[in-house]
Amino acid sequence: MKNQQTVPPTGGQGGLDNQQTVPPTGGQGGSKVVVAFSGGLDTSYTVMKLKEEGYDVYAACANTGGFSEEQLKKNEENAYKLGAVKYVTLDVTQEYYEKSLKYMIFGNVLRNNCYPISVSSERIFQAIAIARYANEIGADAIAHGSTGAGNDQIRFDMTFLVMAPGVKIITLTRDHALSRQ
């Protein structure tokens, strides 16, 4: 198959040895991939690259309350410019607050007695929203822009594996070992 992509195993040392093949067929009707889209460099690259490889790219921004309306509008414009066939904002602000954030506030939960631990907890809610959306539209794959440097990759990968078990996980930034050099 000419345009077939082999997705390297995710998780590295974590043992998630699930090398997968997702054949893009290009254009409307190709393999659907949902990109967890923040509008940053890594997810913008992911949208553009997967479009070039023939995927039908669905960009989804899971908003836990950190994006302004202006930024969400800019994300939508950029997603379409990069080649997404659809863009959605998944508002999980209330769910995140009700199920997690308010308890961290009540408990004054801080990392190293200094930093709110909200970033790590919000990733799970973002990943859940992305997985739900991928299941809703019958996506073949989910992509995210996490690098191999932090724990976000694990939060996304594990949530996707549990919530969307038949869906492939694509992580171009990590798998291509992209850097600024």
Question: Where are each of the predicted segments found?
Answer:
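Intrinsically disordered, low-complexity proline-rich tandem-repeat tracts
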Residues: M1-P9, Q13, P23-P24
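Short, intrinsically disordered, charge-balanced linker/junction segments flanking boundaries
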Residues: P8, L16, L178-Q181
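Short linear motifs centered on Gly/Pro in flexible linkers and helix caps
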Residues: Q13-G14, S38
